[in-house]
């Protein structure tokens, strides 16, 4: 079961929710008032991800790469693939964030400096967005820092709003944590239990736990936002699975989130296939791109032993590794590396060569992975089932891939990509077993 959406829906005459700090910008009311004339149009539900450039905890956190994907890309992929929204937007004040949002297929609202301050609230930015978009009746405010969000979560919440008549729905997670009052010197010198009786301390399996907001999303109708609330009216919570409830705030959260998203994240509509072949560009991936020439005019290259181990790791997993280059590399020099990989050099059309290898092995494109770093790799990167690029690859290559390594070419990028492939293949195998 993907999630639990039980819980009493609370109806209130005066909306109560999380008030904004300070006075939000005045909202221009929607002329439609949420109702159409004649034939009534379905309410316009817009996904809105707030992503300002001035994050204090982690600079440009919203587009920092998590498991090879810009952080904001994880929630954009889930929102777009859910099919639950009439439009998907990113509200930002930063050019780089705008470019990433557009690459993933989102529309961009350029937020003003007035709602981009450290003191600005989410509500301020949402109200400004609505001022420019009278067509929007419902806003699904999705947090960019929740990378394990899945389309099914968003589909079910959209149904709760549209079909079950809720005015607001927000995400929660169930936790089994005992809470104690804080000790304050001079005021309270001893602590007291807040949600348990220590004399009858329950076992985890005997206790339902408590519901906490996990911050993944807040859906609210326009009329609530007009009154300054994201939670109110007829409201309900949506309980997310614990493994999907990931929030990134500070640096220490990053490695934990990375491991979680690799195992529980959403990787797209198409099911991953088992990779059978990895093709790797030589110059700039296997090597760092530097070429040394000896006194007798012999070509000398260097590579990282970690990358050789990565290649060996893939071979042990049954994945063939082949090398390719558009340059007239010395096959003798490459053979001396003892990688035992088939290779083609002086290649003018890399896609044609990879296609020939694919057919020779009886594979579909989804069973091929490619690690590239140059413009000449672009077509291959776009065609294969799994694509990657070193951290120092050209911008054309980086825009075409699904995974960007932390390591540079010739400095561990192949090993990193190999580990990424193995993790995804573990995910594929687990899915098949289920």
Swiss-Prot record:
Known pathway: Amino-sugar metabolism; N-acetylneuraminate metabolism
Compartment(s) of residence: Nucleus
Residues annotated as binding substrate: 52, 62, 111, 120, 122, 143
Motif residue range(s): BC3 motif: 269-276
Keyword rRNA-binding: no
Tissue: Ubiquitously expressed. Expressed in pancreas, kidney, liver, skeletal muscle, lung, placenta, brain, heart, colon, PBL, small intestine, ovary, testis, prostate, thymus and spleen.
Record-listed Omega-N-methylarginine modification sites: 37, 52
Group of enzyme by EC: transferase
Coiled-coil region: none
Family indicated by similarity: Belongs to the CMP-NeuNAc synthase family.
Entry protein name: N-acylneuraminate cytidylyltransferase
Organism of provenance: Homo sapiens (Human)
Gene: CMAS
